[in-house]
Amino acid sequence: MSITIYVPCDSSAVSIGADRVAKAIAKEAEKRNIEIQLVRNGSRGLYWLEPLVEVLTEKGRKAYGPVQVTDVASLFDANFTVGGAHPLYLGLTEELDYLKKQQRLTFARIGITDPVSLEDYIRFDGYQGLNNALKQ
């Protein structure tokens, strides 16, 4: 079973190492023979926690951050792929104080979807307004 790991790909996260972190995660997973699906999502706007790495678990996405390349091996040692405890563990992403108090409308999908994937956009009800308009 593949484990889904999210690492942001927007310019702010990339400028502080998100690409390097994503590559390190992929390399470490391969080294440990752990099958992962690495999704490059948009940032949730928590720049003080970037790169913010999220892991999809049965309870929801669990957040770790800010993650540096030097943290990746210890994240795997702590079983972060199933939400394991680690000094960078922040909890369920949706329960983080900064996000919990928000009702996002315009940016509702930011940090959740891959910003360049039409399949992801459609899966999260993208084009719903267009679909409704065309049916009338």
Regions flagged by a language model, labelled:
Residues 1-136:
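Feature of Fe-S/electron-transfer and energy-metabolism proteins
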